[in-house]
Regions:
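Negatively charged, low-complexity tracts enriched in Asp/Glu with abundant Ser/Thr
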Residues: 1-37, 62-83, 87-112
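Acidic, low-complexity, intrinsically disordered interaction modules
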Residues: 34-66
Length: 112
């Protein structure tokens, strides 16, 4: 197991049991399924560097669309960002926003 694997596994474990390592688009990422039709991908954590930032993607699985992207996330803050994205996904569901066109428009305005 490489040093990158060990470090990423430790970060994944620190986030909690609902997180796992997955390969997404040929990249080893940290993944969490919210169980509500949305999931998150934490990209850029397969590194030995503590200074390298991650990008967190919120996906709406039924439509296979990225709803929101948060870039420049400190690895130590990734759990907090995922929690915020979970709340955002719950808000979308409460408002009944699950159609592709509306999610696409949110995606264009919500990415940071």
């Amino acid at each position: 197991m490489s040093k990158c694997d060990v470090k990423q596994n430790a970060l994944c474990k620190s986030l909690g049991p609902e997180y796992k390592i997955m390969y997404i688009d040929l990249e080893r990422c940290i993944y969490r399924d919210f169980g509500n039709g949305f999931d998150v991908e934490i990209s850029g954590t397969h590194t030995t560097s503590n200074r390298k930032t991650a990008t967190v993607y919120l996906w709406y699985v039924p439509e296979k669309i990225t709803v929101k992207r948060v870039s420049g996330v400190k690895q130590s803050e990734s759990g907090k960002v995922v929690d915020e994205l979970y709340q955002f996904s719950q808000k979308l569901l409460r408002k009944g926003i699950t159609d592709r066109d509306t999610l696409w428009s949110i995606r264009r305005t919500a990415s940071s």
